[in-house]
UniProtKB/Swiss-Prot annotation:
Family per record: Belongs to the MICOS complex subunit Mic10 family.
Main location per the UniProt record: mitochondrion
Keyword Nucleotide-binding belongs to the record: no
Organism per entry: Eremothecium gossypii (strain ATCC 10895 / CBS 109.51 / FGSC 9923 / NRRL Y-1056) (Yeast)
Annotated Gene Ontology cellular component terms: MICOS complex; mitochondrion
Coiled-coil positions: none
Subcellular location as annotated: Mitochondrion inner membrane
Summary of subunit composition and partner proteins: Component of the mitochondrial contact site and cristae organizing system (MICOS) complex.
Protein name, as recorded: MICOS complex subunit MIC10
Transmembrane annotation, as ranges: 21-43
């Protein structure tokens, strides 16, 4: 035996890590949706506003869904496999 104790992470640390991942996912997904909406608006819809709002809505919804999955998981942070 090496005599070293294994210290588990406190639940507060795990919760903070989860919030960091959820908020960063939400910002990234919303930004990607905004960008895709602007791109679609310029190319296909004669610069109307609805594709931008639709893209932002999809981004927020996807970020919320992933955040919900992260908080519902029992094993800490979820690993995404491609």
């Amino acid at each position: 035996m090496s005599g070293q104790l294994e210290v588990s992470a406190p639940s507060r640390s795990i919760l903070n890590d989860k919030w960091d991942v959820v908020l960063s996912n939400l910002v990234v997904k919303t930004g990607l949706g905004f960008g895709a909406g602007v791109f679609a608006s310029v190319l296909f819809f004669k610069r109307r506003a609805f594709p931008v709002w639709l893209g932002v809505g999809f981004g927020l919804g996807r970020g919320y869904a992933e955040g919900d999955a992260i908080f519902r998981s029992h094993a800490g942070l979820r690993a995404v496999r491609a």
